[in-house]
Design a protein with these regions (language model features):
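Conserved N-terminal alpha-helix of the aminotransferase class I/II PLP-enzyme fold
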Residues: 2-50, 54, 68, 75-76, ...
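PLP-dependent aminotransferase-like
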Residues: 46, 54-107
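Active-site phosphate-binding strand-loop segment of PLP-dependent enzymes
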Residues: 91-143, 154
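Conserved active-site segment immediately N-terminal to the catalytic lysine
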Residues: 149-160, 170
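Active-site C-terminal subdomain of aminotransferase-like
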Residues: 160-254, 267
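Conserved PLP-binding catalytic core of the aspartate aminotransferase-like
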Residues: 262-303
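PLP-dependent enzyme catalytic core of the Aspartate aminotransferase-like
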Residues: 317-358
C-alpha cells in the first residue's frame, strides 16, 4: 500500500525504497560491512559488463567457460575489449581444471551455469592472497548457494532468478579490492555512460547508494523488497538454500530410480540446485542422431507444457537435448516432487509412440 510508484526515482521516498532493497539484500546475503552493493541497468549481464569494461586491462585475464554464458564473457573480452585472455573451456556437463587457473591474473567465471546445470563446488580453489580480482557471475547462485565472500571481488546477480522477481535490473557487489582497482586504474578504451562506475577517479557513490546510474523501475524495486522480506520471514539465506536443496534432493531420488534420465553434470559435487538440468540416458535415445534427439526432447517439453505441469522446461538451445527444471528457492519443493511422475509419463508416451512408428 505504500508502493513508491508514479514518483521520480530521485525523490526521497524512492531513494529510501532503493536503499531498503539493497539493505535487505546485504543482510540476507551476509555481505561483509566493507563490501559495496548497488542496483545497475541491464540485469545480471549488465552488471558483469560494467565490471569487465571498467576493471579489465590492468593485468592479465583468465576466463572460465563450460556453457553459454561463460562463453559470452570470452567473446566480449576478445572481440569487444581486444584482450588476449587465457581461457579454460570445458564441454557441457563438465568443469575446466580449476587448479590450472593463475590468480595473478583477473579471473572471470560463472558460479552456477544454468545452461548446463553445472556449478563450481565451492571456493576452495580461489586463494585468499590472490593478486588479481575474481569476477563471479552469480546470477542464479545468489540466495540459493553459500558464496565465500572473502574469495570474491565482484559478484553480480539479478532479481528474476533466485528471488523470482522482475527483469531489467542487475545488482553489483564490490569488494574493497575491486573499489581500489576502480580508483587506481583507467582502461585504455572508451567506457559507455551506463558502464561508468567512477567519477573523477573515485567510485561513484550514487551507484552503490540509492542514486542509480539511470532510471530504475520502481515496480521492480517494490517487487524485490517484497521477495526479500519474504526471504527474511522464512529464515533468511539458510532457509532459501534449504528449499533449493530439497528440490534437488527430490530430483536426485527420482533419477536414482529412473533408467531413462540422468544429470547433465557429470560430477555430483557440481550439480546445480537451481537450474537442474537433465539429460536423457535411455540407450534408445542415445542411439538417435542429433536431429532426432532434439525432436524427441522438444516433444517431451511440449507434452509437459500442454498438461500444465511444467512450463519452458526445454534445455538451453546450445546444450545437449534434455530438460531443465527451475528449482530456485521461490519454487515449492513439493511442486518439483509432484512434477517427477509426469516426466515418467511423458517420456513413456513419447517413447511408445516413436517405437510404434518405427
Amino acid at each position: 500500500e505504500d508502493a513508491c510508484t508514479g514518483r521520480s526515482h530521485r525523490s526521497a521516498p524512492a531513494k529510501d525504497k532503493i536503499q531498503t532493497a539493497m539493505n535487505l539484500a546485504r543482510e540476507i546475503l551476509g555481505l561483509p560491512d566493507d563490501y559495496r552493493i548497488g542496483i545497475v541497468p541491464g540485469s545480471g549481464t549488465g552488471a558483469v559488463e560494467m565490471a569487465m569494461w571498467s576493471m579489465l586491462g590492468a593485468r592479465g585475464v583468465e576466463l572460465l567457460a563450460w556453457e553459454a554464458f561463460g562463453k559470452d564473457w570470452i567473446t566480449d573480452a576478445v572481440s569487444q575489449l581486444k584482450i588476449d585472455p587465457v581461457t579454460h573451456v570445458a564441454p557441457y556437463g563438465q568443469l575446466p581444471d580449476l587448479n590450472a587457473v593463475n590468480f595473478n591474473n583477473d579471473v572471470i567465471f560463472t558460479w552456477n551455469g544454468t545452461a548446463a546445470g553445472v556449478k563450481v563446488p565451492n571456493g576452495d580453489w580461489i586463494p585468499d592472497d590472490r593478486a588479481g580480482l575474481t569476477i563471479a557471475d552469480s546470477t542464479s547462485a545468489c540466495f540459493a548457494m553459500d558464496l565465500p565472500w572473502q574469495k570474491l571481488d565482484v559478484v553480480t546477480f539479478s532479481f528474476q532468478k533466485s528471488l523470482g522477481g522482475e527483469g531489467g535490473h542487475g545488482v553489483l557487489i564490490l569488494s574493497p579490492r575491486a573499489v581500489e582497482r576502480l580508483e587506481s586504474y583507467t582502461p585504455s578504451w572508451p567506457i559507455p555512460k551506463l558502464f561508468r562506475l567512477t567519477s573523477k577517479g573515485k567510485l561513484n557513490e550514487g551507484i552503490v547508494g540509492a542514486a542509480t546510474i539511470n532510471t530504475p523501475s520502481m515496480l521492480v524495486v517494490e517487487d524485490a523488497i517484497d521477495a526479500l522480506n519474504w526471504a527474511k520471514s522464512i529464515g533468511g539465506l539458510p532457509a532459501l538454500i534449504a528449499r533449493s536443496n530439497a528440490s534437488l534432493d527430490a530430483v536426485k531420488s527420482w533419477v536414482d530410480k529412473t533408467p531413462y534420465f540422468g544429470f547433465l553434470a557429470e560430477d555430483p559435487a557440481t550439480i546445480s540446485n537451481t537450474g537442474i538440468t537433465l539429460s536423457i540416458t535411455d540407450p534408445w535415445f542415445v542411439a538417435l542422431d542429433d536431429a532426432a534427439k532434439k525432436a524427441v526432447a522438444s516433444r517431451l517439453e511440449k507434452a509437459l507444457q500442454k498438461e500444465g505441469v511444467a512450463l519452458d522446461a526445454a534445455s538451453y538451445r546450445d546444450a545437449p537435448p534434455g530438460l531443465r527444471i527451475w528449482a530456485g528457492p521461490t519454487v515449492e519443493p513439493s511442486d518439483v516432487e509432484a512434477l517427477l511422475p509426469w516426466l515418467d509419463w511423458a517420456y513413456a508416451e513419447i517413447r511408445q509412440a516413436e517405437s510404434a512408428a518405427a
